[in-house]
Amino acid sequence: VDAETSITIAGERDDYVSRGGHKLAGALDAFPSIVVEGRRALDAGASTGGFTDVLLKRNVGNVVAVDVGYGQMAWEIRNDPRVSVLDRTNVRHLTIEQIGDPVDLVVADLSFISLSLVLPALVSVTKTTADFLVMVKPQFEVGREKLGAGGVVRDPALRKSAVIEVAESAYDVGLGTLGITASPLPGPAGNVERHIRRSAGTPF
């Protein structure tokens, strides 16, 4: 190849530090009434920081990024002064003492645990006016015995029941459901994922 030749590598262009960013961006676009700018947010299951990246690009006030793992978050996200990272932290046992002031926006992308198990902890660290935008991954909601090949939930009825069960669990902790939207991207194995928007004091 000539030294003056420009080379373009074909592939998926990614505006965020992980593909998860596109999932949250799509959900926020589907619910334009959710205000991000200036708010204090919690990113549950932050991992490499895709969701946090979206919030930062939409001018969030600050983000508490929580993950049970360690050292996964992209360097440029971790070093943003608006981000507080809580590594090695199980969100199921999260307390207000760990994060300081309560948050008024919660986003979540959790794996290997049902959302129903973590919602009580999430509610305990939020303001009563908080918005919740959480991703339902059916493969972690329906039970291992109902998974198809490759860990994919192929039955639409099972995917629907996963969303309903999470919505009912949310109602039990005082959260109503305001809307449901499909993720613009499937999970890595092909699972159909959905975002549920919830808010305190909203009818089921």
Predicted features and spans:
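S-adenosyl-L-methionine
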Residues: 64-117
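Glycine-rich SAM-binding Motif I of class I
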Residues: 49-50, 71
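S4-like RNA-binding module at protein N-termini
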Residues: 1-30
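A short glycine-rich, Lys/Arg-flanked "PGG" loop and its adjoining helix->strand segment in the class I
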Residues: 116-133
